[in-house]
Amino acid sequence: GSSGIIPFPRV
């Protein structure tokens, strides 16, 4: 969900 250094998936 984030578009930073580490993209986290939306859960």
Swiss-Prot record:
- What cellular component terms from Gene Ontology apply here? extracellular region
**UniProt keyword list:** Amidation, Neuropeptide, Secreted
In Pfam terms, one family for this protein is Periviscerokin
> Could you tell me the superkingdom of the organism this chain comes from?
Eukaryota
InterPro entries in the cross-refs:
Periviscerokinin
Kindly list the positions at which Valine amide occurs in this protein: V11
The keyword Transport appears for this protein: no
Name where it's found.
Answer: Secreted
Give the main location.
secreted
User: Tissue expression, per UniProt?
Assistant: Expressed in abdominal perisympathetic organs and abdominal ganglia.
Regarding protein family, the annotation reads: Belongs to the periviscerokinin family.
Q: Give the protein's function.
A: Mediates visceral muscle contractile activity (myotropic activity).
Please state what the protein is called: Periviscerokinin-3
